[in-house]
A protein has these predicted regions:
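N-terminal beta-propeller domains
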Residues: 1-93, 129, 133-174, 219, ...
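Elongated alpha-helical scaffolds
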Residues: 80, 99-128, 250
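Residue-level signal for tight coil/turn positions that link beta-strands
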Residues: 82, 115, 172, 197, ...
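Surface-exposed loop/edge segments in extracytoplasmic proteins
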Residues: 91-97, 200
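Ser/Thr/Gly-rich low-complexity blocks that favor extended beta-strand/coil architectures
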Residues: 126-135, 182-211
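Generic recognition of flexible, low-complexity loop/linker segments
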Residues: 107, 190, 200, 238-241
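A generic structural motif
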Residues: 173-179, 207-218
Length: 277
């Protein structure tokens, strides 16, 4: 008895389930295969063998790979390891940078990309952005929030159910501030306090109720007030856990001390978290 064979040229249905074997009445059966291994299916229906692998370099310890797609023709691979990042294009390493993330922190990183900027967040590390300019120069830098009239429009938050009163020794320059409750930790150094319409950067924590700081935006008064708030993100309070883009806004999802909170930037102004009046 002669064996009959047929020519099959269309595999757009991919690898079909064993439950469909023998179902010649279905279009998916006609355009599928029982097994497709190490091949690439083309939109026109044909298949070709996948490309082979090529040794480029040795990965160092724990490594995480992230895509960086500027457009369909400019695609990069970011190789993150212990406090280091290598950038690959095609078959070579084109840049190597130092990073703030240890090998143990790599798999807690969350990221999102817009055009030539990749945003990365980790709950224990200040958020960073990876940028690539037209000359393929790569940089890692801190987020820069929108600033107007000396006010930095980052997210602020009241961490207390009953907010302590806060007062200041002056309205400009180097000042001291105090509260009527235990508030401050040594990790607050470098973070910001929004005091009424003014802004202060903490330079020294002298105790749980006393700090020294530099006025960034002039204070309107110095008396006791409950109208103040901390920067939502700091070494004392933790940093963003996740980040994405939605309807042309940057969305920050949770932080170490505020795991269930969302912050959305102004539309078309990704680093502006001004709440308005």
């Amino acid at each position: 008895m002669n064996n009959l064979g047929s020519v099959k040229t269309n595999f757009t249905a991919g690898q079909v389930s064993p439950n469909l074997l023998g179902r010649g009445d279905l279009k998916i059966y006609e355009n599928g295969a029982r097994r497709l291994e190490n091949v690439i299916i083309h939109p026109t229906g044909g298949v070709s063998r996948r490309r082979g692998l090529k040794y480029i370099c040795r990965a160092e310890q724990a490594t995480r790979l992230l895509p960086f797609e500027f457009n369909t023709e400019q695609i990069y691979l970011l190789c993150l390891s212990d406090y280091k990042m290598k950038v690959f294009k095609d078959d070579r390493c084109i840049a190597e940078l130092e990073t703030p993330w240890s090998g143990n922190q790599l798999f807690q990183l969350n990221y999102t990309q817009s055009a030539d900027t990749l945003l990365l967040v980790h709950p224990d590390v200040p958020p960073k952005q990876v940028t690539r300019n037209n000359n393929e120069v790569w940089l890692i830098s801190d987020w820069e929030y929108y600033t107007k009239d000396d006010m930095i429009y980052m997210p602020y938050y009241n961490f207390y159910q009953k907010k302590p009163q806060l007062w200041a020794s002056g309205t400009s320059g180097e000042i001291t501030m105090a509260t009527d409750a235990d508030v401050f930790l040594s990790a607050h150094v470098g973070s910001y306090l929004k005091y009424q319409s003014g802004l202060v950067k903490i330079t020294e924590v002298r105790g749980p109720r006393d700090i020294a700081g530099t006025v960034i935006k002039k204070l309107s008064a110095t008396g006791k007030t409950n109208d103040w708030a901390e920067a939502a993100f700091s070494d004392a309070r933790g940093w963003p856990v996740s980040v994405t883009f939605h309807q042309n806004r940057m969305v920050i999802g949770g932080s170490r001390d505020l795991p269930n909170r969302l912050w959305l930037s102004k539309s078309s102004d990704l680093f502006n978290f001004d709440l308005g009046k």
